[in-house]
Amino acid sequence: MGISRIRSEQGVLRGLYKFRFTTERGTGCGVMFATSGGRLYGGDSGSSFVGRFSEADGIVSCEVTMSRHYHDPKFVPMFEVEHAVMNFTGVSRGEEIHFEGGSTALPGVHFATVLTPIDDTDAPPPGAVGPDGIGNGLYSIHIRMLDGIDAGNTGVMMLRDGSIRGGDAFFDYIGAYSAANGRWKGEIVNREHTPSRGERPVFGGHEVGIGFSGTYDDNGAEGEATALAGKRSIRFKAVLRKLVEIED
C-alpha cells in the first residue's frame, strides 16, 4: 500500500506537513509525515525527527526523538546535542495544529511549533517495487550539484512502497520510485514550502521536476538526477543513508 493522501477527521494528524518552530535561540522549519498508526517521520536540513503521537479529547500528544544526520564541520546546528527526546502537546486551529513543548536535553528551551498540511494530492502514483527492492524507511539525503555548480543541500526522505515524501528547511519533496535488483529510478517534484531567502536561489520560487536513477543496498542508495528549474537543466548527485525503518 502506498502513502495515504487522505486526511482523517480534524484533530488527528495524517499525511504530510511542514512545521515551523520558534524558540529562544531562533526559528526553524522542516517537514513531517504522520501515519495512520500514530507514527511521525520527518526532519530538516540537519536533523531527523522520529516518534509517535496520540489524540484524546481534542489534545494531540507527541514524543519525538531529534537526531543529527548532517555532520559537515561547516554546518553550525542551532542545538549542540546529537540526540534529544522531545515532548509536545497540541490542539487544532483550523487546518493547523499548534504545539508547545521541550526536552530535558535542552533545559530552558521552549518550543512553540505549528504544523501546516501540505497538499500532496497531485503526487504521482506509487512505482513498482520488487521483493528485493529498496527498503521502506526514513533516509537522510545529501545532494551535491554537478557541472561546476558549487552548491548542495541536505534533508530527509521517506521511502514507502514506491512513494516518496520528504523535504528540508525550505522545500518539500513528493514523488514515486520503482526498484528491483539493486537499481532504482523515479521522479520527484520539489516545491518551496517556506521562502528560502536565497539559500537555494536556483530552486527558490520554482516547482522543480526531477528525474533520477541509481543503485541501492541495505544501508542506503545513491543516484544522479536532472532537475528542470525554470529554463535551466541542472544535474546533481544524491546520497541517501537509511536512518530508521518505518512503521504504519
Residue spans of the language-model regions?
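Tryptophan-anchored aromatic micro-motifs
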Residues: 2-26, 101, 124-149
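Edge beta-strand at a domain terminus
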Residues: 2-5, 55-56, 96-129, 179-180, ...
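Short, solvent-exposed coil/turn segments at beta-strand boundaries
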Residues: 12-16, 32-40, 56-59, 90-97, ...
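Short beta-strand segments that buttress and anchor functional surface loops
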Residues: 19-21, 40-43, 64, 99-104, ...
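Beta-strand elements of well-folded, non-transmembrane domains
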Residues: 23-25, 66-70, 92-94, 105-107, ...
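N-terminal glycine/threonine-rich, aromatic-flanked beta-hairpin/loop signature
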Residues: 25-70, 148-185, 189-191, 231
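Short, tandemly repeated low-complexity microdomains enriched for cysteine and small residues
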Residues: 28-32, 74-78, 101, 113, ...
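An anionic, turn-rich surface loop/hairpin at beta-sheet edges
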Residues: 65-88, 188-213
